[in-house]
Amino acid sequence: MSEHDKDLPLRADLACLDRLLSEVVGEQEGAVVSGAVQAIALRRGDERSHPLPQLAPEAAASLLRACGLYAQLFNIAEDLHHNRRRRAHQLAGSAPQQGSLPRALQRLRQDGVSFHALHQLLSHAKVGAILTAHPTEVQRQSVLDGHRAVRRFLSQLNAADLTPEEREALEAKLKRAILALWQTSEIRHFKMTVRDEITNGVAYHPLAFFEALPALYRRLEREIGQLWGEEARLPSFIRVGSWIGGDRDGNPNVDAGLLRHAVTRQSQQAFEYYLQELKSLYRELSLSSRLVEAGAEVLALAEQSPDQAVSRGEEPYRRALATMQGKLRATARLRGVELACRWDERAPYRDHRELIQDLASLSASLRAHGSALLADGRLSRLIRSVDVFGFFLMPLDLRQHAAVHEGVVAELFSAAGLEEYRALDEAARVRVLIRELATPRLLFSPYLRYGEQAEKELAIFREAAAIQRDFGVEAIGQCIISNCASVSDILALALLCKEAGLIRLEDGQPRASVNLVPLFETIADLENSEAVMRALFALPWYKQLLDSRERVQEVMLGYSDSNKDGGYLTSQWQLWQAETRLVKVFADAGARLQLFHGRGGSVGRGGGPSYEAIVAQPAGSVAGRIRITEQGEVITAKYSDPAIAGRNLEALVAATLEASLGNIPGGEVDTALFDELSASAFAAYRALVETPGFMQYFLEATPVTAIARLNIGSRPASRKSLSSIGDLRAIPWVFSWSQSRLMLPGWFGVGSAVAAYVQKHGDAGLAKLQHLYRHSPFFQVMLSNMEQVLAKADLGIARRFSELVADRELAARLFGAIEAEWRKTHDAFFAITGQAELLEGNPTLRRSLETRLPFLDALGLLQADLLARLRAEPDDEDTLYAIHLTINGTSAGLRNTG
């Protein structure tokens, strides 16, 4: 089947959505707006940069909304088409696709990996996707609800056996859903709070995770059984975690109360799901004791049942399930979790493992008495769900900046009459911290007064310890140190954990209930990470602590700040080198490395396809254990639909298996070559951002100042007032360049690096780069991700934004430098890859972009005009509203902007 034929169903869906949206816009806003939308849709090539029709303010706002809604509907249709193509592959019996479990496992089998080796890896594996709240998540929950309705009706329209009457009825439902979206405000008229973000974060579990994760485990066990002929009972090593409600560095509004609220709200979602499933099992398991026996444990549960109706006397499974529902309600009540049901006074479960025990008793009884088929359905899925989600739904990470920890430790020392902590050098800090960690005495005294920040931080750690007692130790798993630069930064966190009981002494040995995770973010910190970890592992006290964590040490790597600090190529290379060095440090120390990749949605923040990125990791850096962040609008794109969520989680697991056990060629890289490229790229990037006036240029040539005024997220755009890019958070930095369509963080510096290398080494140098591209997954992924950025960028639209800069000489100078680097980067890409055009090897993405670009370009041009108007009239709320519409529409069209 040709690529054209494969896309016919997608084009049919888009035509249907386009027609219905045109009808809605025409009926609601009139022919002028509807005609303008259709005119934009037909713009091609150079026409896309032509001026747009002048409309009255209200009509212009409607035009912006229509462009944005078209992008949203396109995303829905495209996601459904991906699901449809995957299903078509499976029905046709085609070879498994790259990134799928069957493909990954077949490769391992062909590589000679034994069942024992695979099972051993999975027995100690840990794969995590961690949801984070970010200011680039621009869509309201109400809009996402509307998207689900559109997705549902469009999917039903694709059924092959619809009658004309059924099709007409479904189209009417679809049009109503589009009309409801049109009449729903997509703009938040209030600033989001952390509570709002917590509510949004848990919304994806009933949408996708409750269905997708158990299905993924079943599929993995089935595929292993078919390929190796052995039964695989796997532990629950795949987890979805969260930062929402625990990330104080990301959001200074987070406190102990919000941490408790986050876990309680998550727990509520888990309990409601379990009770719903128990009720469904109650309806299904109507087995009569007259016809089939039940095990002793089931009968014991049945005897405790509050359901004493005569009609239930011979239905032991239903009575047992009634007992379990009562115990579960009592468990929720004990933990302060509100449920929309009556409470029960019976004994609660002490932890989720007791619930699993009861469910396992039902399963064993069914299997022992000829009903294994019943045990393998909903009951089996529920057992897996409880094992994965526990009573806390998602493990929550805590994160805070190293400087904040340092301040709290300094205050504790001062109040206790100890050394002036801030005045100590690194060696002295390590010495006094180890001294305090080795003694049972606490520094905190309830009889002394502490500063507001110290009280707040200590309260967070105490609340974390209480949450572990209430919901299980896994409910709070990691404590992350942002901007970690030294051993003392890690030990300072350890001391605060000790003050709260998260680290304690047992028989003189330190024991921790959380992982202490250094986050290396800047280029300098990445370079120093090897020395920090080697010095940490040399401490006898820390060696003992590591023993209590099965010698597993997590290290987080920051893609966003390293990119903002050093540019795209240097960031990628420094991350690679840091991983390679850490693998050796950990091997020397006999520790098990678990890397946590702080990747964003955009390429400038480490984004790109997860499968390719993981498979291209340095040898030994995965070893069955990896966590990655899922941020901003990427969460919606990846996890709002069960099939798509399942595919993304499957790719994460497949890549982990291949990177850990597979024979991946080209894992080595030419260190000298990349050192040279990195040095040139870094010099070019720093020369740009250190140009006098660059910060003024950035503030005026992007919508960053307007973004700061919008009600997108709950956290500030910067940690302090802006005087340099170092003061700016990485997310608005990347987000703003994406909105102006320059995408600078995803490519700048690569062109200069390649040009300098080829100038020095001649044709042989270019040949070496071409050879490296063909054989190095690391280099392939780097250039492939950059290619996607270049394809989405538009220099013409970026030039319009540059014209907003008041200092025309500064604008001409800086945009001239950017344009020159842009051309160098294009030349370098084509010279190395041999391609004639961008996305030559990815026709699906190329066609997708071609369809989106007319609307994306129109939104970009309008945004630039609106920014000029806002700067002339800063208090014009209508203009700010219109800018917000362009930001929403551009985000939807690009799909990964921050």
Curated annotation (Swiss-Prot):
It catalyses: oxaloacetate + phosphate = phosphoenolpyruvate + hydrogencarbonate. Forms oxaloacetate, a four-carbon dicarboxylic acid source for the tricarboxylic acid cycle. It comes from Chromobacterium violaceum (strain ATCC 12472 / DSM 30191 / JCM 1249 / CCUG 213 / NBRC 12614 / NCIMB 9131 / NCTC 9757 / MK). One of its GO terms (molecular function) is phosphoenolpyruvate carboxylase activity. Its cofactor is Mg(2+). Belongs to the PEPCase type 1 family. PANTHER family: PHOSPHOENOLPYRUVATE CARBOXYLASE. PROSITE patterns: PEPCASE_1 (PS00781), PEPCASE_2 (PS00393). Its EC number is 4.1.1.31. This is Phosphoenolpyruvate carboxylase. InterPro entries: PEP_COase (IPR021135), PEP_COase_bac/pln-type (IPR022805), PEP_COase_Lys_AS (IPR018129), PEPCASE_His_AS (IPR033129), Pyrv/PenolPyrv_kinase-like_dom (IPR015813). It holds the Pfam family PEPcase. Keywords: Carbon dioxide fixation, Lyase, Magnesium. The keyword Ion transport does not apply. The lineage of its organism: Bacteria, Pseudomonadati, Pseudomonadota, Betaproteobacteria, Neisseriales. GO terms for biological process: carbon fixation; oxaloacetate metabolic process; tricarboxylic acid cycle. It is an enzyme of class 4 (lyase). NCBIfam families: PRK00009.1. The active site is at 134, 564. GO terms for cellular component: cytosol.
